[in-house]
């Protein structure tokens, strides 16, 4: 597997990245970092022009009002800065363990408020140039633009 092109940018922005493997085996699935109580693992697929989100997992108990999308936003910023605006975030939507949010409701959120496309059941793709902050998303919603 080639060196991940996003790691230098993420490191420059204060994140510690490490290899992500299949259940602790030597089989590499990509790279990972932790932010705002979540672990996010991904791999870049240059030929498909996408950043495949391999895993989003809660690593800390829910405390306070942390933005659950901060890690995704950081990954999208890295992809946009390093790879360009025509790359896509790609992954399967499933709720975090212990969440009161249903998978269907989360999928609706991705379709309605982020503009993500559902390529097949549960599999979403969103152009990195379309990713906006949660506060901007709420402003759009409040102004009737979403």
Curated annotation (Swiss-Prot):
DNA-binding keyword on record: no
Domain of life, source organism: Bacteria
InterPro entries for the chain: LcrR/CesD2, T3SS_LcrR
UniProt KW keywords: Calcium, Plasmid
Pfam families referenced in this protein's UniProt entry, alphabetically: LcrR (PF09621)
NCBIfam families: LcrR
Function: Involved in the down-regulation of lcrGVH transcription in the presence or absence of calcium and is necessary for lcrG protein expression in the absence of calcium. Plays an important role in the regulation of the low-calcium response.
Protein name as annotated: Low calcium response locus protein R
Native organism: Yersinia pestis
Chain's gene name: lcrR
